Structures are given as structure tokens and as C-alpha cells.
Regions:
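Alpha-helical transmembrane segments and their immediate juxtamembrane cytosolic regions
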Residues: 1-199
Length: 199
């Protein structure tokens, strides 16, 4: 067995916490009316189940990078790059087709969400390129992205345009209306690429 049990256990724990948050969303209808982290409106249980979620996506993304580093010990760079690329494409497909359908069971895909699984997929594709660089350089790139991406927080591309959508994919959470489809970019790529690179 080539799997590393501690990584699988941590992934499993993160998945349980994510499931807890999604269950909270379905059974606590008011969570759609106010921020569960608003101390003036929440309670301890609601606050905690939302707060702990902030660790899930970063841990999952970091572990994806860590797993790739362990795979590099038994695969050639070309094999690993192909694995990361194809896995990334598969995750993007799952997010945009299967998961998006599962949210609303809408065959017209009126609502399209670019969220966690999509960001993981694209980050894996970028990592497929980064693995060809020296490891210290990948580390520097990861730290630079994480440390500097907030410098762009005050830069926004306005409107319902392709440039605005492109910038949202990179850095800005945003909603778009595209030919009768509501598009949400919930997980911009830049910070996640930094985290997977550090992993």
C-alpha cells in the first residue's frame, strides 16, 4: 500500500468538518440571512461550525501539494505532471458539471459555481507546470503568492465583461450574469495556487 495513512486521516477529518458545515447550512435556514460569524446574531455552536470551516480548504489544498511531493519520489516528473494535469481536468469537470447539477438539479445550469473543487483542479494543473522548477523556487513562488496577493485587493475590474470574469477567476470573488446564467466565482485561484505550491 503506497498511501500515507496520516495524510488520508487528515483529509478524512477535513471532509467530516466540511460535511458538518454543509449540514448546518441545510438545517439552519437563518444562515442564509445573516453571517454565522456575526457575534450579535449567532450562538456558540453555529459560530464554531462555521469558524472551523476556514481551515478546511487550505488544509485540503496544502495536502494536495504534499501528496504530489510524495508521488514525485516514485514517478518521473513527466508522469507526475500528466497525473496532476489529468486529475485537475477531472476535478474541473466534476465541479462544473456534476456538482453544479447536484446543487439545484437544473439541466439548464442556470446557476454555475466556480468554487472549491474547481480551484483545486486548476491549482493541480498549475502544479503540473511548477514541478519542473527547482523546489526552493517553488517554495519562493508559494510564499510570494500568499504574501503578496492581498496587495491587489483594491484593484477591481468592473462590469459583466470577459476581463472582469478573468480577473475574478484570478483574484476577486464576484457574481456575473451571462446569457441567463448566474455565475459565481467563489474561490479565486491566486491564493490557492500559492498554498498548493507550499504543500
Amino acid at each position: 500500500n503506497s498511501r500515507i495513512q496520516s495524510i488520508d486521516l487528515l483529509r478524512g477529518l477535513v471532509m467530516i468538518i466540511m460535511a458538518l458545515d454543509h449540514v448546518r447550512d441545510y438545517f439552519h435556514a437563518d444562515s442564509f440571512l445573516f453571517d454565522p460569524l456575526d457575534l450579535g446574531k449567532t450562538n456558540g455552536a453555529i459560530y464554531f461550525t462555521r469558524w472551523i470551516m476556514h481551515f478546511c480548504a487550505p488544509v485540503f489544498m496544502f495536502l494536495a501539494g504534499t501528496s504530489a511531493a510524495f508521488m514525485a519520489r516514485r514517478k518521473t516528473k513527466k508522469e507526475l505532471a500528466w497525473f496532476l494535469f489529468t486529475r485537475g481536468i477531472w476535478l474541473i469537470f466534476l465541479e462544473l458539471v456534476v456538482v453544479n447539477f447536484g446543487w439545484n438539479f437544473d439541466v439548464l445550469f442556470t446557476n454555475i459555481y466556480f468554487v472549491t473543487i474547481w480551484a483545486l483542479g486548476v491549482s493541480m494543473i498549475v502544479l503540473a507546470l511548477l514541478i519542473f522548477l527547482p523546489i526552493p523556487l517553488v517554495l519562493v513562488i508559494g510564499f510570494a503568492i500568499i504574501g503578496a496577493h492581498n496587495l491587489f485587493d483594491n484593484f477591481h475590474v468592473q462590469g459583466n465583461t470577459l476581463p472582469a470574469f478573468g480577473w475574478a477567476l484570478l483574484h476577486d470573488q464576484a457574481f456575473f450574469d451571462w446569457k441567463g446564467h448566474n455565475v459565481l466565482v467563489g474561490y479565486p485561484l491566486l491564493p490557492w495556487i500559492g498554498i498548493i505550491a507550499l504543500g
